[in-house]
């Protein structure tokens, strides 16, 4: 039988450089990715290096709260 609490949760990854710059004049928005993580394997906040179409480079995307 499956447990009532799901192990995999849906998370949102947001570009840290776009947020830090306060959406400067060069970028027109904030890049966000939707993915899943296993709560048992990675209990801490997830950070991945992904491509940001607003910064035009690979940046660190951190997990945010919904």
From Swiss-Prot:
One of its GO terms (biological process) is translation. Coiled coil: none annotated. It is found in: Plastid, Chloroplast. This is Large ribosomal subunit protein bL33c. The keyword Ribosomal protein applies. It holds the Pfam family Ribosomal_L33. InterPro entries: Ribosomal_bL33, Ribosomal_bL33_CS, Ribosomal_bL33_sf, Ribosomal_zn-bd. SUPFAM superfamilies: Zn-binding ribosomal proteins. Keywords: Chloroplast, Plastid, Ribonucleoprotein, Ribosomal protein. GO terms for molecular function: structural constituent of ribosome. Belongs to the bacterial ribosomal protein bL33 family. The lineage of its organism: Eukaryota, Viridiplantae, Streptophyta, Embryophyta, Tracheophyta. The gene is rpl33. GO terms for cellular component: chloroplast; ribonucleoprotein complex; ribosome.
């Amino acid at each position: 039988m499956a447990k009532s609490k799901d192990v995999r949760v849906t998370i949102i990854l947001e570009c840290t450089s776009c947020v830090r710059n306060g959406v400067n004049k060069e970028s027109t928005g904030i890049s966000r990715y939707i993915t899943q993580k296993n709560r048992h394997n990675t209990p801490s906040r997830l950070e991945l290096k992904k491509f940001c179409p607003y910064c035009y480079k690979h940046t660190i995307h951190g997990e945010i709260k919904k």
